[in-house]
A protein has these predicted regions:
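Nucleotide-activated chemistry modules centered on ATP-dependent adenylation/adenylyltransferase
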Residues: 1-185
Length: 185
């Protein structure tokens, strides 16, 4: 199926739902955390990056889902008292995640751009067969939301972007995404 383009608020974005996506992620992290906690006897915490920006489209990004998931984990396993489960961005958005990332990079003396150039949230990543490089698109909802967060943060996204014509500049991305955002104000 074709990945829809535009803003998350549009009804067609429900086509981007991956069934049980966050349950898959949480099941893996819960299993690893429980194994570590059991082996070491130490508190072991997990965190999922689900955030409020996704509530409208993804049912597994809501507090009710998180609580039910944690309950199922605790009911379905022994010795879970040393496993913590956090969803720090449940009431936040991608901007909040970036803002915390910026602070943590500074605190850890890590270059923010070196970290975020290695990330890609695109639902339609573009592969350049000549250079063997991956690019983010700027048209899918996940990319629009990411660009919006970087704009709010006041810094350019270090990740490379492209469209059907090839690599594009950050300025081009900002121009195109600003048009999409203006339609949804």
């Amino acid at each position: 199926d074709e990945v829809p383009e535009g803003h998350y608020e549009q009804d067609n974005m429900k086509a981007t739902v991956v069934p049980n996506r966050n349950k898959i992620f949480s099941s893996i992290t819960q299993a690893v955390a429980l194994s570590v906690a059991t082996e070491t006897g130490e508190q072991t915490d997990i965190a999922l990056g689900i955030h409020a920006g996704d509530h409208a489209i993804y049912p597994d990004c809501r507090q009710e889902w998180r609580d039910a998931d944690d309950h199922a984990f605790r009911m379905g396993n022994w010795d879970v008292e040393n496993v913590g489960y956090f969803t720090p961005y449940l009431d936040g958005d991608k901007f909040d995640i970036l803002k915390d990332g910026e602070v943590l990079c500074k605190d850890l003396n890590i270059d923010f751009d070196d970290v975020y150039v290695r990330t890609n949230t695109s639902y339609k990543p573009i592969f350049d067969e000549d250079t063997f490089e991956w690019y983010s698109d700027y048209k899918s909802a996940s990319s629009v939301e990411r660009v919006e967060a970087f704009l709010k943060l006041g810094r350019p996204d270090p990740a490379p972007y492209a469209d059907e014509t090839g690599p594009v500049t950050w300025e081009h991305v900002v121009t195109e995404v600003s048009k999409i955002l203006a339609e949804h104000e």
